């Protein structure tokens, strides 16, 4: 079984003072959010084959996060800031940038469909569009499997940070949380699903979707035209 490398794994390693992590490609799955957090913290993820020794000597051009980091440090009083403060400010800047981009970005992804209709989506290629049903909150949504694939079900990714919004489901939905935690408020109680958990929401439910932190999950809905029923 492959090991799932999540954003929390990166944060924990960084908190321990580590600056890099080596993973074996064939035995690991690195989530997109883990890569984003690693870039944010200046943390290096080295991907290697089992037969190749881990190396952290790769030198690359300055990434966007490094440029943001340098700009932030340049505006802070010399010697009067901590790495934790810099990380918090970087996260704020990148989230604001992501929110602006999300407002104009069209959802997209790379996939391959076989002759018999079997479809494989490259999870790392997924770019989010904005879910209109959650305005004014910036909620990302990308449909990956739709009626156009000849499917009676739909599937896709959703993600957002620190927001709650009402929604009524005229369809059945199953959600598998990939990152963070998903809160669903319904009939006076709050159900919480964390990374690795699966949640079922029956048709006809009037709920409040949300998270006090951040969440990214895979949804499967029936029927496939869930947005128009």
From Swiss-Prot:
Artificial BMCs can be made in E.coli by expressing eutK, eutL, eutM, eutN, eutS (eutSMNLK). Cargo proteins can be targeted to them. The addition of eutQ to the eutSMNLK construct results in biogenesis of multiple BMCs. This can lead to the development of tailored BMCs for specific metabolic reactions. It is found in: Bacterial microcompartment. One of its GO terms (biological process) is ethanolamine catabolic process. CDD domains: cupin_EutQ. Its main location: other. Pathway: Amine and polyamine degradation; ethanolamine degradation. GO terms for molecular function: acetate kinase activity; ATP binding. NCBIfam families: PRK15457.1. This is Acetate kinase EutQ. The gene is eutQ.
